[in-house]
Amino acid sequence: PGQLGNSGKPGQQGPPGEVGPRGPRGLPGSRGPVGPEGSPGIPGKLGPLGSPGLPGLPGPPGLPGMKGDRGVFGEPGPKGEQGASGEEGEAGVRGDLGDMGQPGPKGSVGNPGEPGLRGPEGIRGLPGVEGPRGPPGPRGVQGEQGATGLPGIQGPPGRAPTDQHIKQVCMRVVQEHFAEMAASLKRPDTGASGLPGRPGPPGPPGPPGENGFPGQMGIRGLPGIKGPPGALGLRGPKGDLGEKGERGPPGRGPKGLPGAIGLPGDPGPASYGKNGRDGEQGPPGVAGIPGVPGPPGPPGPPGFCEPASCTLQAGQRAFSKGPDK
C-alpha cells in the first residue's frame, strides 16, 4: 500500500437541516433579584359605607360661653283676673265740728230740684315703683347626652387617573409578567423583550374594612364664639292669680270741706205761739245732693203774730224747725 496522502480541504457548508422536535421543559430557574418599587396602582372603587363606630367617651365640659346680648322685650301678657276684695278698713276718726255759719236770709221756697248728674271718673293714679330684682334661681340639672347624629354626606370622588399613570401601571404589570415567564423557562439565549401589552381592566373593589377601635379622647376645645342674639320668645302663659295683700294700717283722712247750705224747710202753719221751750236736738240728717234752684214760688199768706213776740219768734225760727210747742 502507498503512503497516506494529505488531508483535503474542508468542504462547503451544507444546507441547514430541518428543525428538530421540541425538547422537554427545563427545570425552573432560581428566583431573580427583587426589582425596584413600582408606582402605586389605580385606586379601586369607593367601598360601601361602614357601620357607625362605637360612641366615644364623653369629652370634658367646655368653658362657659360669653354672655349673650339682652333679648328683645316680649309682648305684654294678658290682663290678670281681678283680685279678691280687701277687708273693710277701720272707721276713720270723726272730724272736728265746724264753726257755725251766720244765718242767711230767708229765701223763697222753691220746688225740689232733680238729682244732679254723676261727675266724671277721676284720673287714674300713677303706677307704683318697681320692686328690686330677685336673686337668680338655682342651676338646673345637666341634660342627657343627645342621640347619634345622621351620617355625613358622601365626599367628592377622587381625581381620575391620568394617561401617564395608566402607562406606568401597565409597564409594571408587563414587566412582572415577563419576569415570571423568564424564571419559568430555561433558555440558552435570552431573547429580545417583546412589546408591552394592552392595559388590563381595573380590578374589582376590595371588601370593606373592619370597624376600627374608638379613638382616644380629644383635646379640650377652645371656647366658642359669641353667638347672635336670640329671636323674640313666644308669648308666655297667663300667670296665676296673685295672693291677697296684707291689710294696711288705719289711716286718717283730711278734714272735709264744709257742706253746702241745705234747702229751706216748708213754711209751717200759721200759729199764735209764745215763748216755747227749746226742743231736743235731733240726729244729724244725711247731707242731700244740691239740686238745681227752682223758680221762685208764689208769696205765702200773711202771718199773724203779737207785736211783743214778733222779734223773739223771728230769732227762734233760725235755729229750730216746725211750729212751737
Curated annotation (Swiss-Prot):
Cellular component GO terms held in the UniProt record: collagen type IX trimer; extracellular region
Alphabetized UniProt keyword annotations: Collagen, Extracellular matrix, Hydroxylation, Metal-binding, Repeat, Secreted, Zinc
UniProt biased composition (Basic and acidic residues): 237-249
Domain notes: Each subunit is composed of three triple-helical domains interspersed with non-collagenous domains. The globular domain at the N-terminus of type IX collagen molecules represents the NC4 domain which may participate in electrostatic interactions with polyanionic glycosaminoglycans in cartilage.
Bias type Pro residues, positions: 198-208, 292-304
Full protein name: Collagen alpha-1(IX) chain
Primary gene name: Col9a1
Bias (Low complexity): 1-54
Top-level lineage group: Eukaryota
Chief location of this protein within or outside the cell: secreted
Cited function: Structural component of hyaline cartilage and vitreous of the eye.
Biological processes per GO annotation: bone morphogenesis; cartilage development; chondrocyte differentiation; chondrocyte proliferation; growth plate cartilage development; skeletal system development; tissue homeostasis
